[in-house]
Amino acid sequence: EYKKFVYAGHAGATGDAIKMVEGLDADLINMDLVNTQPNSMILPSGLGQYCNPGVAGAYKAGAYMVNQNGERFFNESANAWDLMQAMKQNEAQYLIMDQTAFDNFNAGMTNSKIYTMEDVEKWLSDDYDGQPVMKQGATLAELCEKLNLPADAVEASAKAFNDCAAAQTADAFGRTPAAAQSEEGPFYALQMHIRYYASLGGLHINDSMQVLNTKQEAIPGLYAAGEVVGGLEGDVYMGATLFGWAIASGYDAANAVNAVIAQ
């Protein structure tokens, strides 16, 4: 399942520490779990990139997502976990934006130094065929033609969305749009993906930061800290928590080693 997601982690996160302890019978936990997140684009480098700074403003201005059939499929403003489960059912999904939503999206992304407007100009060029997939059309129909999406389905999705925005009522997915999408172009689309950073699994340690073997015994002289340790997050990654863990676990591991040296 994870092979169809886009990698967004550090280039150096290659699992070397796990390989180093293979001959020590080290116990590994949660190695079947991976940190995955929605709201992602693919950068020209091929790496996944979170788009949270951009989608927040875009959704407030009437942006929405459609799948490969041109249909909306979920509440785009829902929590990340539920949105990701819905995205997993699609072959592809695209964020559809009018000019205001597109401007808001780019403002959030450029203010976060993720890319520049010069990048956007390049990506929108008709002769650009790399990542990210970002397209522009004078009308929704023209935009759909560039994406090979059924225009009638996308236009129907837009009408249903705008009707709910005008009435300020929740749509079939439970979202009450804060604003309608403009009926006048241009319109923009960005292909969205699920990204993953790293495994949520790793080495099994005890309270003294010692690595355990498969018999749950401490391996003499072997300590671990940071992302190489498994089990901190359970089966769901909680955003930004690993920063604190990196500091705290490193501190505890160093203190544990110093205590042994001092004996």
Q: Where does each model-flagged region fall?
A:
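A conserved FAD-binding loop/helix module that cradles the flavin
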Residues: 1-20, 190, 229-261
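An anion/pyrophosphate-binding glycine-rich loop and adjacent beta-alpha core
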Residues: 18-20, 27-149
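Short, glycine-/Ser/Thr-/acidic-enriched flexible segments
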Residues: 69-72, 78-81, 99-103, 195-197, ...
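Function-dense linear segments that define catalytic or interfacial modules
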Residues: 97, 105-120, 221, 232, ...
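Short, small/polar residue-rich loop motifs at catalytic or cofactor-binding pockets
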Residues: 58-60, 197-199, 239
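A glycine-rich dinucleotide-binding beta-alpha-beta segment and adjacent secondary-structure elements
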Residues: 153-236
